[in-house]
Swiss-Prot record:
<dbReference type="GO" id="GO:1990904">
    <property type="term" value="C:ribonucleoprotein complex"/>
</dbReference>
<comment type="function">
    <text>One of the early assembly proteins it binds 23S rRNA. One of the proteins that surrounds the polypeptide exit tunnel on the outside of the ribosome. Forms the main docking site for trigger factor binding to the ribosome.</text>
</comment>
<protein>
    <recommendedName>
        <fullName>Large ribosomal subunit protein uL23</fullName>
    </recommendedName>
</protein>
<dbReference type="GO" id="GO:0019843">
    <property type="term" value="F:rRNA binding"/>
</dbReference>
<dbReference type="GO" id="GO:0006412">
    <property type="term" value="P:translation"/>
</dbReference>
<keyword id="KW-0687">Ribonucleoprotein</keyword>
<comment type="subunit">
    <text>Part of the 50S ribosomal subunit. Contacts protein L29, and trigger factor when it is bound to the ribosome.</text>
</comment>
<comment type="similarity">
    <text>Belongs to the universal ribosomal protein uL23 family.</text>
</comment>
<dbReference type="InterPro" id="IPR013025">
    <property type="entry name" value="Ribosomal_uL23-like"/>
</dbReference>
<keyword id="KW-0694">RNA-binding</keyword>
<dbReference type="GO" id="GO:0005840">
    <property type="term" value="C:ribosome"/>
</dbReference>
<dbReference type="GO" id="GO:0003735">
    <property type="term" value="F:structural constituent of ribosome"/>
</dbReference>
<dbReference type="Pfam" id="PF00276">
    <property type="entry name" value="Ribosomal_L23"/>
</dbReference>
<keyword id="KW-0699">rRNA-binding</keyword>
<dbReference type="InterPro" id="IPR012678">
    <property type="entry name" value="Ribosomal_uL23/eL15/eS24_sf"/>
</dbReference>
<dbReference type="InterPro" id="IPR012677">
    <property type="entry name" value="Nucleotide-bd_a/b_plait_sf"/>
</dbReference>
<keyword id="KW-0689">Ribosomal protein</keyword>
Length: 99
């Protein structure tokens, strides 16, 4: 059951200009993760899925934007983002992850 939980930790890679620059320069991958996970869960999931060594993990909560149409006001969901810094010599191919 623990392995099944680790497979659900990572939702998707966060693809943006900033994350692609971080991957090229500093060997950092940026991931969207489930809101309730801890750094240890993220560490185990990334190590298991990609077979890499991790140097450091930074996690932050991204608050949802307020969106409105005419008189209705709504909010997008909050989500968690993880910056995973890999040790030297390890790389991750994010193109295979998106499939």
């Amino acid at each position: 059951m623990y392995i099944e939980r680790l497979l659900k930790v990572i939702k998707a890679p966060h693809v943006s200009e900033k994350s692609s620059i971080a991957l090229d320069k500093n060997n950092v991958i940026v991931l969207k993760v489930v809101n309730y996970v801890t750094k240890q869960d993220i560490r185990h999931a990334v190590c298991m899925l990609f077979s890499v060594k991790i140097k450091k993990i930074n996690v932050l909560m991204v608050s949802g934007k307020s969106k409105g149409q005419r008189y209705n006001l709504g909010y997008r969901c909050n989500w968690k983002k993880a910056y995973v810094i890999l040790k030297r010599g390890y790389t991750v191919d994010l193109m295979n992850m998106e499939q």
